[in-house]
Each structure stands twice: as structure tokens, then as C-alpha cells.
Amino acid sequence: MRARPARRVTRPLATALVAAALAALCLAPAAAPLHAPVAAADSVRDRQYWLDDYGIREAWQVTRGEGVVIAILDSGVDAGHPDLVGAVIGGHDVSGRGNSTGTQPLGPQGITHATMVASLAAGRGSGPTSGVIGAAPAASILSISLAFGANERDGDEQVAEGIIWAVDNGADIISLSLTRNQIDWPESWDEAFLHAEENDVVVIAAAGNRGNGTEQVSAPATIPGVLAVGGVTRSGRASDNASSQGITIGVMAPSENLVGAVPGGGHASWQGTSGATPIVAGIAALVRAAHPELDAAGVINRIISTARPVTTTVPDPNYGYGLIDAAAAVSAEVAEVDENPLGSIAEWITLYRRADAPDIVSTLPAARPALGREPAPTAFGMLGSSLVALEPGIPALVIIGSTLGALATLAAGGVLRFVTRTRSE
């Protein structure tokens, strides 16, 4: 096992950020904001079935994530929400539209997204038995605000800058509930994700939602070394609507019947791998807190090695290494590793960014749309998911992923050929 390396000196942002142009996005009408009083304890905390089903409460007997920093790259976290008071310790805006601390929820479509994500990762709850409590309630949050859409700053540039800022400002874990809706990524991301890898930061990304037309895991989760998170139903089956499939899925986490905090003090039920991802990010924070000697590769190895297999084939294209198990990830005996079992972006760059490198993207199979569905457009956005207000008197808000500019789709995975080779060695 390698000792956890010291954080490197800040590297400058790449002088030229090469970014793919965004496809025009279709914006849906703005929905009524979910500003409402905090719901009663039995309608929020008691709905968090994953705390017991996935060993999170048991893991809290060892640690609650103290001293670990999770960066949320999303639409801007409402740091004043009762469930997040004291959790957000800083942030930054890369969209050009948010406030300087990245804590202004940007909308209209994405206004709820980041706050929901943050609450599942490191929410404190509004009381001992009320509000949403995250998987790592003692971890801290950095909020990096993004804004995606036809009239916004280039999304690729925002993500690259946001990742580098997060690394340079103390993030131990980066949670990405967003996608390019393609398996490849721009060269500007090479610099950003390499910066995270070289500075010992765990990067976790969502595998996407088939319900939004994303049939195949997409970047940033296709980047080697990134832990891709798929979604399962309450019963532990791969979600038909809230999870994409791909050979690079790392672990599965709950993605249906979720509840999260929304700006203004309210809560909403929702589904999608946007929610599964921060749960895993919180569990990664528990592992980092319990095992401070581990580097990022060791943290990821503990998470995938202790996952509960669902099939006899591991990893499986639908379930990866299995269902996340927080208690085992924190406490089980796990063999040490010297390298990230999910690959290395540094090695990938060496192999595939040469002038004479093979064009691996054109040789990969295209995702096949489900029967009766149109393929998802090439678009950048945060994960679309169904969202229903919990507070009485607040109308339900339904978000249809690929039809919203700010909530197009979320996905995650790994470049297929490269990761297949890595896992078979």
C-alpha cells in the first residue's frame, strides 16, 4: 500500500481549455420553487431507508466523516438550508452567474439539484430525528456552482476549472452528478482529472439514467480512475429508469424513493443516479476518515472490494462490483493495493493522446436506445430525475431530464477498451 501522498503545490489552469461545443438544449417552463417549511420528522428522516439497508448507521459507530472535505460540482448549494447549516465551508462559482462562494442556487431548472445532492452526501439534519442526514454528516462541503445551457459559458470549461479549484482548495472527494452524454471527453479534462489523480483526490460520478435516454455510461464517469455509481431500486435491483449500464460501473447505490433537501428549507422525493452518487461520496468520506493512511486508490479499493455482489460475474455491466456496503467499507479486512483498480488517467493520456494513438472512440459500440425511445442528444447537464415535493400545499415538480437545459442527463463510467484491459490484467 502506498502512503497517502502530500498535496502538491497548486498547478495553473491549462493555458488552453479545449472544449466541445454544446448542443442546443430545449428548456422547459420554469417550475414553482419549492420554498416551504421543513417537513415533519416522520416524513423525511424515516424515509431514508438507505441509512440502515446499506450499513451507514453501523459505520457511524466508527466515524461520521470528521475532517473530510467533499466538493459538490453542481448548480450551487443552499448553505442556509436547516439540514446544511455548518456543512458548507466554502466554494466558488465557475459559471459567471453565481455568487463568489458558489452557494447561490442557479436555475430555474437546476435550482434544486445541488442542494439535494449535498444533503445526501453530508447533510446534518435539522435536529436529532428531523431533516435529511447525509451518509457522512460530519464531513464538510465545498460548493462549486455550474450553469449549463445554450446561453451559458461552455460546460466543459466550467467542469475543468471547477475540478482544479476543488483540488487546490482542499477537496478530498469530488462528487459529480453530471454528464456530457458521450463516452469521450475534451482534452481540458485530461488536465483537470490528472490534477485530481496526482493530488490524491477521490472522484465519484453518476452512471446516468436510462429513463432520460442515457443507455450507456458517459463521461465524466468513463474517465479511468473515476468511481462510477449506478442505481438500484429499494429491493436492490438495477433501476430500469434511474440507472444506465456499462462495463465500467463501479458500485450500485439506492437511486429510487430518495428524499433530499431543496433550497428554502423544504424537502422533495426524487430518483436517479444523481442521488446515488453523493451517497457513495459520503461513504467514501467515512472510509477516508476511518483510514487516513489510505491514498485515493486505497479508498476506492475498499469501496469496491466490500460491495455485496449481485451476480456471479464481477464486475457486472449492470451492477459493477455490487451493492455499496458502508459498514464493510469502513471496518472489513481488505487487501492493500498499490494502484487504483479502476485505472489511471495518467496512463490513459500516455496511451491515447499521442499523435499516432488509435481512435478508440470511433471503435466503441454506440449506445442503443430502448425500444420506443429516441437516443439522448449530445448535451451537457445535471441529471434529470423525477422530483415530488413533500410539504403539503406545494405542487409536484416533474423534471424530464433530456428536455431541460440545466438538467439534461447524468452519467458515469469509463472508456471501455482501456478499462476492460486494466481490469483483466
Regions found by a protein language model. Name each.
Residues 221-289:
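Extracellular S/T/G-rich loop segment that most often corresponds to the catalytic His/Ser-adjacent loop
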Residues 66-69, 137-141, 168-174, 198-203, ...:
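Loop/turn elements at helix/coil->beta-strand transitions in domains of secreted/extracellular proteins
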Residues 60-70, 77-90, 104-155, 244-248, ...:
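Subtilisin-like serine protease catalytic core
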Residues 397-425:
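C-terminal membrane-anchoring or membrane-association module
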